[in-house]
């Protein structure tokens, strides 16, 4: 990034966690601007809006509007219900919606003995979540992508079975 965008402004979501800003500054970006939740900035003919979800470990989604095309990149943010409806109402119709369909976290690797409320992730949960999200957004094009993990230690290699691919997602949705 720093090779191609040296001296350029970088815009990131404003959230309580300063990690993104610190990481960007650590690789040499000097002009890092944090955009508050639901506020927009125009960069030439491109309008950018961040939506932040969570209190301490913020998930962010970004809406990019340009030339009559609207892109919603939800990444792995857990947006649903009224907040998602508001985004679609404020920016819709959505042409391209991007969202993760596969988990990349450690929750599958542990159990909490005696805690009946603890639920480990399952592959179908992420497929179902992707479908519900796209049903709510109704984009012209749904773009699945996978967060990823790769467990290499013998004690946890079995958890690689939680990885899913877009073909499996398609089969689930159909």
Residue ranges, per PLM feature:
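A general structural motif
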Residues: 6-8, 68, 93-94, 139
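Short, charged N-terminal helix-start/capping segments
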Residues: 2-6, 67-79, 108-119
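Core dinuclear metal-dependent hydrolase active-site scaffold
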Residues: 34-105
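Active-site HxH/HxHxD metal-binding segment of metal-dependent hydrolases
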Residues: 1-36
């Amino acid at each position: 990034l720093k090779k191609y965008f040296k001296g350029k402004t970088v815009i990131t979501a404003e959230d309580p966690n300063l990690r993104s800003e610190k990481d960007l500054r650590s690789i040499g970006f000097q002009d890092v601007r944090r955009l508050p939740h639901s506020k927009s900035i125009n960069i030439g003919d491109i309008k950018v809006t961040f939506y932040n979800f969570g209190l301490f470990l913020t998930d962010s989604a970004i809406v990019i509007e340009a030339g009559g095309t609207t892109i919603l990149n939800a990444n792995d943010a857990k947006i649903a219900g009224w907040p998602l409806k508001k985004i679609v109402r404020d920016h819709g119709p959505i042409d391209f919606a991007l969202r993760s369909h596969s988990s990349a976290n450690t929750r599958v690797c542990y159990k909490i003995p005696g805690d009946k409320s603890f639920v480990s992730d399952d592959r179908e949960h992420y497929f179902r979540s992707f479908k519900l999200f796209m049903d709510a957004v109704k984009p012209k094009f749904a773009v699945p992508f996978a967060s990823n993990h790769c467990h290499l230690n013998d004690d946890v290699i079995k958890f690689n079975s939680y990885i899913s691919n877009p073909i499996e997602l398609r089969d689930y949705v159909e």
